[in-house]
Amino acid sequence: MEYLVLSDSHGRADLIDRALALQLRAPDAVLFLGDGIRDLRVLEYQDICVRPVRGNCDFYTLFEGQSAPEHVLLEVGAYRILMMHGHTHGVKGGMERAVAFDAQAEADVLLYGHTHLPRQEWLDAGERVAGQILQKPLLVCNPGALQDGRFGTLTLNNQGILFGFGSL
């Protein structure tokens, strides 16, 4: 499975199309990590799955009357992906609360936004974070802010997990 990972478009819907155009093949889904949900309207009539979470600047949703969740846990084959914007877990001050929340969900990948800073870090099984002990390795990723031309890609297959960064 291949995913385009976007966050923090902040009104730059045009950059969503540009990031999609750079992909070698159509992703299985767009994972949107908040702050610009209304920008996803550019994908409304395209045949592409969109999985959004709400950010601190998302006062309106993609579809009237619906609200995007603050967290989404995706199960893809043997993998679990936890998506969040991160503002409710204080990610600008550190990742401890977000990783502890993830440890409870037992996810393999934690995707977040909010800081606008690209990040990729592997945490080992057995690490203690905010009182939680990770039961398995965890890949923590932030694609950076799409408004700054940054995005991510996530590939999951039977050989493992690969996260990459892209720029416009």
Segments and roles (model prediction):
Residues 1-50, 65-69, 158-159:
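N-terminal active-site segment of His-dependent metallophosphoesterases
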Residues 2, 49-51, 80, 139, ...:
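Conserved beta-strand segments of alpha/beta enzyme cores
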Residues 5-7, 29-35, 51-56, 82-85, ...:
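Active-site neighborhood of phospho(di)ester-bond hydrolases with catalytic His/Asp-centered motifs
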Residues 10-15, 37-41, 57-62, 88-94, ...:
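Active-site environment of divalent metal-dependent phosphoester hydrolases
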Residues 15-22, 83, 88-102:
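Pre-active-site segment of Zn-dependent metallo-hydrolases
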Residues 17-18, 76-77, 100, 105, ...:
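Binuclear metal-dependent phosphoesterase catalytic core
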Residues 42, 64-66, 71-74, 101-102, ...:
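Short secondary-structure boundary/capping segments
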Residues 49-92:
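Helix-adjacent hinge/juxtasegments
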